[in-house]
Amino acid sequence: MQWTVTFYSEKVKNETLALPSGILANFLRVTELIETFGPDLGRPHTAPLGRGLFEIRAKGREGIARSVFCTVKNREMIILITVIKKGNKIPKRFMETAYQRQQEVLGHA
């Protein structure tokens, strides 16, 4: 049974699909793998972040992007936020935004 990859909002979808072409190509490849094999691909594709959040690591000649996602029932994963990586860690404010969105999606807000 396949997984479904969706976005938290149209804004998140548009921001993600506006990634530079090399990064976007890698992101789309990873999401295809997730649809087939599930989100637990392991590094270098996906990694746990804690608190029920995970990341997709998309690399291209232009740099690295990270998309934070959570999983919900019926084999669905929701991309909560995407950011171009500028340092070693995802900025705290982006993680807080992702966590708040996760709580909303899961009905805990």
Specify the residue positions occupied by each region the protein language model found:
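Hydrophobic/aromatic beta-strand elements that line small-molecule binding cavities or substrate pockets
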Residues: 67-69
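Basic, Lys/Arg-enriched alpha-helical interface segments
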Residues: 1-64, 73-77, 84-109
